[in-house]
Amino acid sequence: MTVKAAEASGPALTYSKMRGMVAILIAFMKQRRMGLNDFIQKIATNSYACKHPEVQSILKISQPQEPELMNANPSPPPSPSQQINLGPSSNPHAKPSDFHFLKVIGKGSFGKVLLARHKAEEQFYAVKVLQKKAILKKKEEKHIMSERNVLLKNVKHPFLVGLHFSFQTADKLYFVLDYINGGELFYHLQRERCFLEPRARFYAAEIASALGYLHSLNIVYRDLKPENILLDSQGHIVLTDFGLCKENIEHNGTTSTFCGTPEYLAPEVLHKQPYDRTVDWWCLGAVLYEMLYGLPPFYSRNTAEMYDNILNKPLQLKPNITNSARHLLEGLLQKDRTKRLGAKEDFTEIKNHIFFSPINWDDLINKKITPPFNPNVSGPSDLRHFDPEFTDEPVPNSIGQSPDSILITASVKEAAEAFLGFSYAPPVDSFL
């Protein structure tokens, strides 16, 4: 989840509290929590980075038709009334007043994630609350509906977060999701710096299983990173945040949208070339590398250098991993996507790799393998694995209220109309 942007320049910051490393890690931590749009705007205003030819190519700085990238006279957002209908309408079965909103547990570009208890059911949920105005301003309606669509397909897979309800008020959208309180993989990596190989293998296997399932539905995830990987209360992986997913990508299909998280962008994405499902296997390689070594494979504090590393620098692997791990990383982090592991048979190639030979995949999917780490949460109210930056923040009163219709402006009504079809209530037997 995106929190806040790092400063464009400034003195080195310390990181003794978590990893015991200094400026490189605090810069890394802040940088990767930025949305890609904010990150691109940051490097576009950095004179040093802009001089690098690879960065210029990525940003197309020499072309004046993209003023928003340079923060120069950005064009106004389109009128909400001109937005597309985002899907077939359904009868909403939930409203904000159905919930007690207890704690802020996350923040994103368009809103917050809150721990909430359903008043009638006494069930705990993670409720993602998004501001329509912010979504429309950045023209992100398609990504929001894409996230909803992907969530609707997730109820059958154990390593993907499930959607229980989605509904809307005049000014907000609400995703009512599984509540997962074992912490982000990123949080645990901060604390422990890296994992032993058996633990990294277990997580990589569950992640690969989730990605393989999405690919079987012709969905490319595109934003795999430790912040989007949660641990449940037993220590199993749960993949979340599907806003950048691309639907309807057949086995040999490609797409070309420039999106993702900077440290994890595959070379073909940076080159603005068409890319396919193998972009997810590159990201899996980057996450596995980080679990084993503590940082992504081509990371640099200098943006231009990091992009140049991804595009041109050979993969460097220290000798403290097994040969099978080395071989897997070399296959996943292959710069030529046509030669990348998974290019031919997708998930089948991954699970058949020798690195995963200790994994019984049937037991894995049925959660019969004991996780190597137990978060030891005492119950839903145990928030020890959430960042205090979130949990110390007061819950806004407006979250649990529907705006008074008398006070709603015409523009707010138009915004509401832009998200027709967002609301969702599952069939009675969908979770049986």
UniProtKB/Swiss-Prot annotation:
SMART domains: S_TK_X (SM00133), S_TKc (SM00220). GO terms for biological process: apoptotic process; intracellular signal transduction; neuron projection morphogenesis. One of its GO terms (cellular component) is endoplasmic reticulum. It is an enzyme of class 2 (transferase). Residues 357-432 form the AGC-kinase C-terminal domain. ATP binds at I105, G106, K107, G108, S109, F110, G111, K112, V113, K128. GO terms for molecular function: ATP binding; potassium channel regulator activity; protein serine kinase activity; protein serine/threonine kinase activity. CDD domains: STKc_SGK (cd05575). Pfam families: Pkinase, Pkinase_C. The active site is at D223. Residues 67-93 are annotated as: Disordered. Keywords: Apoptosis, ATP-binding, Cytoplasm, Endoplasmic reticulum, Kinase, Nucleotide-binding, Nucleus, Phosphoprotein, Serine/threonine-protein kinase, Stress response, Transferase. Residues 82-92 have a biased composition (Polar residues). InterPro entries: AGC-kinase_C (IPR000961), Kinase-like_dom_sf (IPR011009), Pkinase_C (IPR017892), Prot_kinase_dom (IPR000719), Protein_kinase_ATP_BS (IPR017441), Ser/Thr_kinase_AS (IPR008271). Its EC number is 2.7.11.1. It comes from the Eukaryota. Protein kinase that may play an important role in cellular stress response. May be involved in the regulation of processes such as cell survival, neuronal excitability and renal sodium excretion. Belongs to the protein kinase superfamily. AGC Ser/Thr protein kinase family. This is Serine/threonine-protein kinase Sgk1. It comes from Gallus gallus.
